[in-house]
Amino acid sequence: MDVHKEVNFVAYLLIVLGLLVLVSAMDVDAKACIRECGNLGFGICPRSEGSPENPICTNCCAGYKGCNYYSANGAFICEGQSDPKKPKACPLNCDPHIAYSKCPRSEGKSLIYPTGCTTCCTGYKGCYYFGKNGKFVCEGESDEPKANMYPAM
């Protein structure tokens, strides 16, 4: 009878330890954001754009800081000089040497309008959010979900 109790205790202990290991291995975002709607006017998320076959129309002055701009043959032209938080007054001409850009964030929309219930807390990192008056409010604080996080079944 004592052996049976010891086996049950060891089995129970192994199950509890297994659950603890499983829970600690989970990637849980503990950030709790409040649901507050309608305070942001729009968001800008600098994204990679264009290709050698489908060039973009921009110049180094108007290109976003943090994004690199390349020619059709892949030669580096410049890093963008315009900060989305404080845009520079730049000429609107297209630099014929620039074909495409590579930005740290490359998926999703560049312009988010309307923002719905997005807040600074729920907004994506690397995206800049502005009030309805066009003034910079904040940079997003949440990680952007992966493209195929929940594949269709």
Swiss-Prot record:
The gene is PIN2K. GO terms for molecular function: serine-type endopeptidase inhibitor activity. Keywords: Disulfide bond, Protease inhibitor, Repeat, Serine protease inhibitor, Signal. Residues 1-25 form the signal peptide. Induction: By wounding. Sequence repeats lie at residues 30-86, 87-146. The keyword Transit peptide does not apply. Belongs to the protease inhibitor I20 (potato type II proteinase inhibitor) family. The record marks 92-93 as: Reactive bond for chymotrypsin. Inhibitor of trypsin and chymotrypsin. Disulfide bonds join 33-121, 37-117, 45-127, 57-94, 60-78, 61-90, 67-103, 120-138. The keyword Signal applies. Pfam families: Prot_inhib_II (PF02428). It comes from Solanum tuberosum (Potato). This is Proteinase inhibitor type-2 K. The lineage of its organism: Eukaryota, Viridiplantae, Streptophyta, Embryophyta, Tracheophyta. The record marks 35-36 as: Reactive bond for trypsin.
